[in-house]
Amino acid sequence: MSKIAILTDSSCDIPQELAEKYGIDIMSFHILLDDVDYIERESCTNEEFYEKMRAAKGIPSTAAITPIQFCEKYCQYVDEGYTDVIHVPINRSGSSTYNNAVMAQGMLREERPEHHLRIHLLDPHTYSMPFGWYVCEMARKLQNGAEISHVIQEFETQMDKMEIVLGPYSLKQMKKSGRISAAAAVMGELMGIRPIITLIDGKTKVEAKVRGDDKVVPAMVELAKKRSEGVEDFDYMIGHTNIPQKDDLIKACRKAFGRDPLITFPLGGVVSANTGPDTIALVYVGHAR
């Protein structure tokens, strides 16, 4: 009989109650800010971390989960009699974490040469709840008796459709992470120009620029409507850093899409370390790529 573990990392932004409900293991990233090392989901709440970023002199940096840490986790699964682990780390193109998991599989063969653990390593091609939600869906379906091959195929199909539109209201972190140029960040702050950014298949792109904070939400919603036109299984989620504009986005999306979001969720430390502490995100199901 199969015994299946589901493993992800704290970039998934899965709420703790859902992780506990579905038995999902979440390994935490370390985030360094002003020489203080924070362990995501342990050291402070998301809201506390936003405030620390707003008050900080420097820019946060994140450390990938190491091959040794992954190997130790895999060994734990072997020792506990698991037959399979579905491992969904952060987007491969944005972190060395995925490659570290690949290295850990080689280390496991050395540590437990006769092990029979099947490791299903999946690249979500995205960040945060756009994959975290569907990790929960995999776990739910497995609990209801679905075949592991079926839930993996469904997950990968869904990841080929997920798109994110970001609306950052402060640009310091975006500049540091390279998502916008230093010149664009300076001009944006001086003139109130806000970039509308997509994150699709692990890649970011500035799709538009609007002048004034009040133009951000309408531009985000219009872009999502345009890109998702004709999608039969359309749904959406809203991410935020607990700023007032999240309510404007929820209201605008309800009007535009005629339904409530699947979930409204706070952006975690790893994600907000790159987007900044004043960001809203519209996640939606687009066309298959």
Give the positions of each predicted feature:
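N-terminal glycine-rich anion-binding loop in soluble enzyme alpha/beta folds
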Residues: 5-71
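Glycine/charged-rich beta-loop-alpha catalytic/anionic-binding loops adjacent to active sites
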Residues: 55, 83-87, 111-122, 264
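Short glycine-aspartate micro-motif
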Residues: 5-7, 85-87, 267
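N-terminal glycine-rich phosphate/adenylate-binding segment common to multiple enzyme folds
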Residues: 69-101, 105-108
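Hydrophobic residues in alpha-helical segments
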Residues: 53-54, 78, 142, 175
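Short coil/turn segments at secondary-structure boundaries
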Residues: 58-65, 89-96, 125-126
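Mixed-charge interfacial surface used for oligomerization/domain docking
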Residues: 3, 11-19, 24-25, 30, ...
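Anion (oxyanion) recognition and catalysis
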Residues: 20, 79, 113
